[in-house]
């Protein structure tokens, strides 16, 4: 094969890999999770959520979802709620976050999350710090799940608008931390 043809193939492969990369660039594994405080809801009741307080109890699954009561976000919340016994067994807590207001989150915490885990408001600063701006709609968060160890380090990241793998991947990472 002539040298120029080989070069074109390599350039083509490189371009393909770059185009196949995810559009969002989440925090990398090993990064320190940015600390934050915000308001949230659990079982319809408001509360203040502080990342450092959550980490005192063990690893945390912090999952960002675009908008409460949309089909994918509701199905994802129900899947996390169904898996809460396994997350507890692994010693992990779960918190969902979106840019929704507190009144919406109060309803979502009971109807979709089934009173099993809290959801909280992601401020613009938190959305930026966790690099979860939804590129197509910047007022929303991307669907990105983080598993953060009790020292505050990101040990797993999964960013995909399809909600289906988020629960299984975060649970596997939480279980691996327990070993």
Predicted regions and their residues:
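Short active-site neighborhood of thiol/selenol oxidoreductases, capturing the structured segment around
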Residues: 51-74
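Cleaved targeting-peptide boundary
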Residues: 22-32
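A short beta-strand-turn-helix
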Residues: 37-59
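Thiol-/selenol-based redox modules, centered on thioredoxin-like
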Residues: 140-179
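Structural microenvironment flanking redox-active thiols in thiol-disulfide oxidoreductases
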Residues: 74-114, 126-128
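Bacterial N-terminal signal peptides
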Residues: 10-22
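Short loop/turn microsegments at loop-to-beta-strand junctions
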Residues: 34, 59, 136, 142-144
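Bacterial N-terminal signal peptides that target proteins for export
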Residues: 1-13
């Amino acid at each position: 094969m002539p040298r120029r043809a080989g070069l074109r193939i390599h350039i083509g492969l490189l371009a393909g890999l770059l185009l196949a990369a995810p559009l969002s660039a989440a925090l990398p594994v090993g990064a320190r999770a940015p600390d934050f405080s915000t308001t949230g809801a659990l079982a319809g009741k408001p509360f203040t959520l502080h990342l450092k307080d959550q980490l005192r109890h063990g690893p945390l699954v912090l999952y960002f979802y675009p908008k409460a009561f949309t089909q994918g976000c509701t199905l994802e919340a129900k899947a996390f709620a169904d898996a809460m016994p396994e997350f507890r067994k692994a010693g992990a807590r779960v918190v969902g976050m979106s840019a929704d207001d507190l009144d919406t989150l109060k309803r979502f915490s009971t109807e979709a999350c089934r009173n099993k885990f809290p959801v909280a408001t992601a401020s613009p600063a938190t959305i930026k710090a966790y690099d979860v701006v939804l590129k197509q709609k910047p007022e929303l968060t991307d669907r990105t799940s983080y598993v953060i160890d009790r020292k505050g380090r990101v040990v797993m990241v999964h960013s995909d608008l399809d909600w289906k793998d988020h629960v299984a991947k975060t649970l596997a990472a939480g279980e691996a931390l327990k070993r």
